[in-house]
Amino acid sequence: RQRQMCIRDRGNMVASMGFKGLLTEGAKHILGWKSPHFVYHCSQNPNLKLLLRDYKLSDDISLRFSNSTWSEFPLFAETYMDWIAAVPEEEQVINIFMELCALGMFQPLSSNILEFLKALPACAKARGISFSTPSEVIDHHKSVDALEVPYPMSWVDEERDISCWLGNGMQREAFNKLYSVADRVRICNDSRIKQDWDYLQASNNFRFMTTKSSSWNMYRGIYDSPYDAFTNYMNILGDFINRVNGMYPRDIDNEELNSLLTLIKNQ
């Protein structure tokens, strides 16, 4: 699964890495009239199957379960399985995907979320509904059609795009400054630099900077506002860049860096 189910047409690359399938969002602007309850394949590579998240049924658990103002509150396992049982019989694959932080963070344990999950298997069995892993679905179901994803897509907000990460000037400034030292980081062999580089690329660093309104309570980690997140990130990033430049000064031009990269690859 891509982080936050971000995807764009890159089927050949993913298939070349040995993957047989990809989990992604069942966004309306990509599906059009199609249903997310079938297996599809990537338009670039028919060998790469796509499993599309049913965002309503997924978000009913991960986002709305403990919301006392929700029209379906409180949600019981029997009701949830009745919704799934009501899906047309020919639509045999219903993908429920969510982050683990939905259990205990977005939905506190006091909401009885774990008891709800424990009750699901028995309620499903009583209605003739079975569970499968993504690999089992990919192995046992044929693709019904190709699906083209020409624009970046995610499972976040109504737009289902990447504007939550790169939609404002702060996010783009931080992103561009981070990757301005990418070539230098690639050629370094300092394990702490490599580790911090991975940390700095975490998608939540940029998501915490979003100024978009959200249909659910936006989790910002330790920050009170997107501006606090931006300020703290840029301070840390500035220190990181100084460390990188201490190893590979800015006056090393791209041609020299490329020569170093080529030398490393050939070793």
PLM segments and residue spans:
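Binuclear metal-dependent hydrolase catalytic cores centered on His/Asp/Glu-rich metal-binding motifs
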Residues: 61-75
